[in-house]
Amino acid sequence: MPFTLGQRWISDTESELGLGTVVAVDARTVTLLFPSTGENRLYARSDSPVTRVMFNPGDTITSHDGWQMQVEEVKEENGLLTYIGTRLDTEESGVALREVFLDSKLVFSKPQDRLFAGQIDRMDRFALRYRARKYSSEQFRMPYSGLRGQRTSLIPHQLNIAHDVGRRHAPRVLLADEVGLGKTIEAGMILHQQLLSGAAERVLIIVPETLQHQWLVEMLRRFNLRFALFDDERYAEAQHDAYNPFDTEQLVICSLDFARRSKQRLEHLCEAEWDLLVVDEAHHLVWSEDAPSREYQAIEQLAEHVPGVLLLTATPEQLGMESHFARLRLLDPNRFHDFAQFVEEQKNYRPVADAVAMLLAGNKLSNDELNMLGEMIGEQDIEPLLQAANSDSEDAQSARQELVSMLMDRHGTSRVLFRNTRNGVKGFPKRELHTIKLPLPTQYQTAIKVSGIMGARKSAEDRARDMLYPERIYQEFEGDNATWWNFDPRVEWLMGYLTSHRSQKVLVICAKAATALQLEQVLREREGIRAAVFHEGMSIIERDRAAAWFAEEDTGAQVLLCSEIGSEGRNFQFASHMVMFDLPFNPDLLEQRIGRLDRIGQAHDIQIHVPYLEKTAQSVLVRWYHEGLDAFEHTCPTGRTIYDSVYNDLINYLASPDETEGFDDLIKNCREQHEALKAQLEQGRDRLLEIHSNGGEKAQALAESIEEQDDDTNLIAFAMNLFDIIGINQDDRGDNMIVLTPSDHMLVPDFPGLSEDGITITFDREVALAREDAQFITWEHPLIRNGLDLILSGDTGSSTISLLKNKALPVGTLLVELIYVVEAQAPKQLQLNRFLPPTPVRMLLDKNGNNLAAQVEFETFNRQLNAVNRHTGSKLVNAVQQDVHAILQLGEAQIEKSARALIDAARNEADEKLSAELSRLEALRAVNPNIRDDELTAIESNRQQVMESLDQAGWRLDALRLIVVTHQ
């Protein structure tokens, strides 16, 4: 094409220069000025890498003054174009705009504009864009979206709770699984789902100070959620950046003490518009009707302002009824306002639990039982389901399951309370107790005797506590530097045990930090044993370092010496040997100690070693725990109740361990009480809750579905293709691990999630669980999501040209592959992607408008095509521009039908699902007061907004490929 002064051209290789103007032409060269950057370029006339910019009727163009015009006619005179049309701002028609006055900052965003302007992408980028659209759409439609990306084992009961709660609007629930069943992971899964779907954006986690760092690391390592830890220092810093310091971060962790200490700080927390509040160790919030604690009041105030609340707590039996009611009251004060009424309700759950047990047993039901079930469910037309459940047909089992679901929906706190027990969850190790009876040294005997004389006025409780720790009595008289460890037989036994088990990791727990520090020194100096220490005097980072050193396999510490605080919230299930150097004062603390090793996922039986001194409170307590409560070898939900009931007698025996008369009877009575309470707990409400929380076959099927997805080879192929195109180096390290590092030729200079030093990744869940240094890559990992965003939010791969070598077709035959996207714009919290994620519609048109896409599959077709360089491609486009325009118009005429079908299907699905959920909850509202009014209102509002957004759904051309047939 001849060059003329004033013509507008665009550079094929430097499209960022914008629109160029021909300012000089001679026999061999042409000079273009690019006004938007002020740069000149000199090109050879014969084969210059530039493309003539020509607009067509229907296009919208912008003048250098900023006003826009819809083109209706194009005139050419002496090689220069004049566009005639209607101005969009004044609606003036017949306006002429010469091409020299076009806006130089012109950006070609439509695929066809980019193609005609010579902005042609590599063929592999077009293929990647289509795959990104296709896979992205498929992932949004997965029923377990949000549950696959976490680095956790696929444990059915955890997945069941997360799947149920994570999909709710502003969930307000109590997670009260027994110790070791993974409440933190359940909470993380719920957060991950809510954040990924857009249901929540701002999250506040409040935990005891000792657990802050653990939550921070756990959320990042397992769920790729980067929380900010707020303490006094961080809060003061953030005050310089915003009126409300908490507005500076979306995801925040702080301690309960930090939140409670300052009135202004609590007000700032309440005003920060969180979507979700998570409170760990919620059983520490003390409440009574007359005097709730300040901690309880602080959380109560926050819970009034935050729509979604997750409370993590000990089991209801351990708490006692009043304390349990107090947690539920935080979640829904309107529903749980009267403690006496709550107690009465709980008594009425026995018949429901019996009915559920009856259905699950599979026995034939009598007419009376059928009538009772009908009355309990209170639904019309329930008769056929009852008959099916009582028949021998194939549908009997599913009918019984449906009736169980209905019963649980309608009765009790199953919507707000989740509680799994070890009885209902398989996969726990055995616990084996080894008691080591040791003689009481004369030094201790003397100290105890003197202490008894001098402390005669002490209360029985104080004397009992003293008698548990004889080394402290000795130090009271001999001074803090008294070397009790030189004669205490427990120390000698511990050193012998550790030296004979050098290959074993051993957790040693004692009540006081001073004991742990003194033991570390003795072990190091006498036997060269590597021991890490973990106590309340250390900073969080120091504790983390100690825990990490203990976790290291080859060069790590053999022993971790913990004070009592070390047994709250920290998990060391890679170890299976525990030594209790002394015993805690109550059964809850004992269970907490053992719970650090006894967790789901523990591979070995747990060996619990208790060296104790005879004729001390230790010898009394070891018998009471083991023979009276069976608390060492099994979890003991009855412990707190029995402890409270025999407290005074037990204290007297502990204070005077020599006086054992009647102690055998006490143990016998406690054991009988324990067995009776245990039997009682296994009936009634607990059974109902357990069935609901566990999820049964449904939860198992969910875990299996996700496991199948873990083997998705499409992800690996797509990820490697994505990394190649972004410019990320990949180095296979074996053992299913790959090291990714940035290259010098990245699509973007800083890719989110990829550090300068690189990262190690794996696509294998088992490898990710074993290797903390490897990131677990799934469709939900930020690296993949950021990659999808990078490709799909820009124009990468949106226009390309390929050659098809096929002698069955005439040379020069044109095909145009069009990728349309059908989508609806809506706020993220509506979660419209459940029904209509941005969905690609592929068309492959010839010049007559025949759509060959159904006959010619994308990947097969893509392998038959050859790439064209950009310069040759521009020439081809110019030669067939009018034909391509005509095919595009045929495509526009055809897409409407396909797009409308997708939109209608999405509307029907949304209407059906959201209306069904609303109807179900409205029906249940009549019989189950645990359904909140605001939840019903939110679902109805959500349904209306979703339907309105789907009514506004549309489609657009996202990418196109021009294919030219050749025989060479």
Swiss-Prot record:
Keyword Transmembrane helix: no
Motif, DEAH box: chain positions: 280-283
Enzyme class: hydrolase
Catalytic activity, EC: 3.6.4.-
This protein's UniProt keywords: Activator, ATP-binding, DNA-binding, Helicase, Hydrolase, Nucleotide-binding, Transcription, Transcription regulation
NCBIfam families tied to this protein: PRK04914.1 (NF003426)
Assembly description: Interacts with the RNAP. Has a higher affinity for the core RNAP than for the holoenzyme. Its ATPase activity is stimulated by binding to RNAP.
PANTHER family documented for this protein: DNA ANNEALING HELICASE AND ENDONUCLEASE ZRANB3 FAMILY MEMBER, SWI_SNF-RELATED MATRIX-ASSOCIATED ACTIN-DEPENDENT REGULATOR OF CHROMATIN SUBFAMILY A-LIKE PROTEIN 1
HAMAP family named among the record's database cross-references: Helicase_RapA
Name recorded for this polypeptide: RNA polymerase-associated protein RapA
Species assigned in the record: Escherichia coli O6:H1 (strain CFT073 / ATCC 700928 / UPEC)
Gene expressing this chain: rapA
